[in-house]
Amino acid sequence: MAGLAPEGSQFDARQYDAKMTELLGTEQQEFFTSYDEVYESFDAMGLQENLLRGIYAYGFEKPSAIQQRGIVPFCKGLDVIQQAQSGTGKTATFCSGILQQLDYSLVECQALVLAPTRELAQQIEKVMRALGDYLGVKVHACVGGTSVREDQRILQSGVHVVVGTPGRVFDMLRRQSLRPDNIKMFVLDEADEMLSRGFKDQIYDIFQLLPPKIQVGVFSATMPPEALEITRKFMNKPVRILVKRDELTLEGIKQFYVNVDKEEWKLETLCDLYETLAITQSVIFVNTRRKVDWLTDKMRGRDHTVSATHGDMDQNTRDIIMREFRSGSSRVLITTDLLARGIDVQQVSLVINYDLPTQPENYLHRIGHSGRFGRKGVSINFVTKDDERMLFDIQKFYNVVIEELPANVADLL
């Protein structure tokens, strides 16, 4: 049935085990390392002083659920599979694990992180650089749409960590500009998304070029069967860290829907909302690039300052737009799912799904941004007759109830 979550997409330990049993048969018992320690504070994790300084300077106070369980096993050099949604602090989990283990006197690539999109790779590069600020870490993002020669120059001058998209990273390995000899940590972020974008072969090709003894981390919001296959091929007795299904609520985010009889009436509904609410910063999601342009024109025509990004724009333009949005000079960003995972703006208090996503999984990536690390956020979904089924699927998929938008919505923001 169209619109329903694909089987095995929401991470469920029982389902995962059943799938692994199917793949591994009787070896399954020996496959995982059990690790149950939970660390309530960053100070208790035994991290280097300068890494802690970076963590606190970045604004983290208390570790999130995934950080409490995930940082230490990674620091110990264990293979880890971690399942957590966007906005839970998983990027900082593997960044901390990598930064703790680097040999800073050796200016060679020691850690390789793969991500599905340029935006996400650049986001990870930023977090890594900020957390490693007091350690003097050298990080570089190798992504498509940028100068190959510039990549080669930076890699040859020496870096500790490379973050990138599979295509460009493989290219750099093939050209021998990125030398794999000292790489000891390999992380796949948003593994589900990389696989669904058809990067499987490239990931396998990259893995073949890495040293045989390597620590592997797989991070994924969902776990489709292909991700399990990677787990089995690449990993050695991984520690499995689940933020359990009931913790995978979209905690701290109030979710509402607005019934809109006709598609044409969404614009009026949107403008009414902006007139009644004092919104600091908001992101509006639509499903097509053309609609991004259309809605941007309509909003500007009504004197709203809005920014827009989508996949047809070149990288440079997108970077400039995201910078404006982050700095607050533009308060509204209109975009598509493609960029949902690369948006990390701490002040976003409202996400509007002008169009509901076409798959339930993407709902989490969109609205996970409005409630980062315990900040309260609000998401409002515009629902036409045709969307009712998808709204139902989303509620079922995440086990949430999305209520009709109350009249006093202004008090919630």
Curated annotation (Swiss-Prot):
SMART domains: DEXDc (SM00487), HELICc (SM00490)
Top-level EC class: hydrolase
Record-linked PROSITE patterns: DEAD_ATP_HELICASE (PS00039), HELICASE_ATP_BIND_1 (PS51192), HELICASE_CTER (PS51194), Q_MOTIF (PS51195)
Gene3D superfamilies (UniProt xref): P-loop containing nucleotide triphosphate hydrolases
Disulfide-bond pairs as recorded: none
GO MF, one annotated term: ATP binding
Keyword Amino-acid biosynthesis on entry: no
GO biological process, one term: cytoplasmic translational initiation
Catalytic activity: ATP + H2O = ADP + phosphate + H(+)
CDD domains reported in the protein's UniProt record: DEADc_EIF4A, SF2_C_DEAD
EC number per UniProt: 3.6.4.13
Cellular-component GO terms for this entry: cytoplasmic stress granule
PANTHER family according to UniProt: ATP-DEPENDENT RNA HELICASE DBP3
UniProt similarity note: Belongs to the DEAD box helicase family. eIF4A subfamily.
Name used for this protein in its record: Eukaryotic initiation factor 4A-11
Source organism of this protein record: Nicotiana tabacum
Biological classification of the source: Eukaryota, Viridiplantae, Streptophyta, Embryophyta, Tracheophyta
